[in-house]
A protein has these predicted regions:
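Short amphipathic alpha-helix used as the core "switch/output" element in two-component signaling
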Residues: 42, 64-77
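Active-site residues of response regulator receiver
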Residues: 55
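Alpha4 helix (beta4-alpha4-beta5 surface) of REC/receiver domains from two-component response regulators
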Residues: 65, 87-103, 111-114
Length: 128
């Protein structure tokens, strides 16, 4: 039996983490959350994380720096990263940092789920 995909939600707002995790659970995914870079890296390196969803702006950290770090590391470079922000010019910044895609806040959960499904399916095909 195939395991459920594991998705890491990285945001310093616990309410957003809870909301996204509830939606992911509803759609049959396993989800973990982290509120900072240190916890996120520990989770990614100690679990088989299939996708990361993260805010561009975090307390004490820049999501784009975390994204760059993950994409430059051989162990984590293949993990799809979906970033989000309410900042008007954030999309270009996030994509330039290596994010695989971007969602503007506020976002519709259906839009987020479509992007997640796309990246997980693409990753699955690449592993076959």
């Amino acid at each position: 039996m195939k395991e459920k995909a594991l998705i890491l939600v990285l945001d310093d707002d616990p309410d957003i983490c809870i909301m996204i995790k509830m939606v992911l659970d509803y759609y049959g995914y396993d989800a973990m959350d982290a509120e900072n870079e240190e916890n996120a890296i520990k989770i990614i390196l100690s679990n088989h994380v299939d996708l990361v969803i993260m805010d561009m702006l975090l307390s004490g950290a820049d999501g784009t720096d975390i994204c760059r770090r993950l994409k430059l590391d051989k162990e984590t470079s293949s993990i799809p990263i979906l970033m989000f922000s309410a900042h008007p010019t954030a999309k270009e910044t996030c994509l330039a940092a290596g994010a695989d895609d971007f969602i503007s806040k506020p976002f519709e959960m259906n839009d987020m789920m479509e992007k997640i499904s796309f990246f997980l399916e693409r990753k699955k095909i690449g592993q076959e």
